[in-house]
């Protein structure tokens, strides 16, 4: 069980760290040049620059994943639920990104896979917690 929490926490921390750094870079320079991204990629999107995507990346994906990592490291009772939500959120983020600007980089697919693994680990953790709780209730006669 410890391996599940450690694996989940590590994935969340790495994804979160990358999102915080890249989100901060997009907020600092919304043209995207710090990340070698051209605003032309946004032509068919609702955005004229990378400021709003940078804010979302920083706050939702970055801060959310780091918070999830802390919950997982502490084996918090909601780590599974939060991790599943963040994993699904990451997959949605990548899906929308690929559909808006195209799938041009292998990292997009790697992050989608990370979201899927995060969701699977979270479900395994939550399933284990639910089974443990069920056994405790059966033993106590509730």
Listing of model-derived features with the role each one plays in the protein:
Residues 1-142:
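Topology signature of small-to-medium multi-pass alpha-helical membrane proteins
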